[in-house]
């Protein structure tokens, strides 16, 4: 069967963990703690196919708030494919990337509020869950440290690859970068123009709505005697 991680088609089968599917298909899902369910770097949003996945367990409930569950939030290292169907997931990093590149200010505010709510309300239960698992023998600290160490190298490479994919102009010649940077400034100014009702623009930008370079807030004349 084919599932989609950040819109990338990935081969999978019933019984697979979402995290393992991502690894095998070189899709972007973080895995710093090696699948021990403590770092939350494998957090994903299930956009479609929640009924094809296992029910959230206690480890997930300890870290994920009701708000994030309502948005389809899951930990990929704790989520198993239980039946065939259409499954689409979006990683937290990819969702944030799309919000930033799309200059979605309201979306960013909502995103930040939800994440802040989750940290504030679930941090105590998350820590309690880790302590409980260590005490019961379900979590081996030595093994966990080893998994973190082995996962840092591929994880850092994955971050680099996805950064270059998200911002390809970083590999371009300087003259090309300047053009891309100007375009980014114009886009940001356009968003500011829309939000402010046309009253504000970024200095040096070109607003498509007004079709003229934005003026600096204040002009300063410097003369030498």
UniProtKB/Swiss-Prot annotation:
Pfam families with a match to the protein in the record: Fer2
Major localization class: other
Chain ranges of the 2Fe-2S ferredoxin-type domain: 1-95
SUPFAM superfamilies: 2Fe-2S ferredoxin-like
Places the protein is found: Chlorosome
Positions that bind [2Fe-2S] cluster: 33, 39, 42, 77
Cofactor, free-text remark: Binds 1 [2Fe-2S] cluster per subunit.
InterPro entries: 2Fe-2S_ferredoxin-like_sf, 2Fe-2S_ferredoxin-type, Beta-grasp_dom_sf
Keyword Kinase: no
Gene Ontology cellular-component terms listed: chlorosome
Record-level GO BP terms: photosynthesis
GO terms, molecular function: 2 iron, 2 sulfur cluster binding; metal ion binding
Cofactor needs: [2Fe-2S] cluster
Sorted UniProt keywords: 2Fe-2S, Chlorosome, Electron transport, Iron, Iron-sulfur, Metal-binding, Photosynthesis, Transport
N-terminal signal peptide: none
Disulfide bond residue pairs: none
Biological role stated in the UniProt entry: Could play a direct role in the oxidation or reduction of the quenching species formed in the chlorosome.
Name listed for the protein in its UniProt record: Chlorosome protein J
Annotated organism of origin: Chlorobaculum tepidum (strain ATCC 49652 / DSM 12025 / NBRC 103806 / TLS) (Chlorobium tepidum)
Gene this chain is encoded by: csmJ
């Amino acid at each position: 069967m084919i599932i989609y991680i950040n819109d990338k088609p990935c081969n999978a089968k019933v019984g697979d963990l979402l995290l393992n599917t991502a690894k095998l298909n070189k899709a972007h899902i973080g895995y710093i703690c090696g699948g021990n369910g403590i770092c939350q770097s494998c957090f994903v949003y299930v956009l479609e196919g929640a009924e094809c996945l296992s029910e959230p367990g206690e480890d997930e409930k300890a870290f994920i708030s009701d708000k994030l569950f309502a948005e389809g939030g899951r930990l990929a290292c704790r989520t198993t494919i239980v039946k065939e169907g259409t499954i689409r997931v979006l990683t937290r990093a990819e969702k944030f990337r799309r919000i930033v590149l799309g200059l979605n200010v309201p979306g960013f505010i909502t995103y930040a509020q939800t994440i802040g709510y989750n940290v504030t309300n679930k941090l105590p239960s998350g820590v309690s869950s880790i302590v409980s698992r260590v005490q019961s023998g379900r979590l081996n600290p030595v093994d966990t440290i080893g998994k973190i160490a082995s996962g840092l190298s591929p994880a850092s490479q994955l971050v680099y690859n996805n950064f270059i994919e998200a911002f390809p102009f970083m590999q371009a010649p300087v003259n090309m970068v300047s053009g891309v940077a100007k375009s980014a400034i114009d886009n940001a100014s356009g968003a500011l123009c829309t939000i402010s009702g046309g009253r504000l623009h970024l200095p040096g930008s070109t607003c498509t709505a007004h079709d003229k370079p934005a003026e600096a807030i204040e002009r300063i004349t410097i003369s030498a005697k």
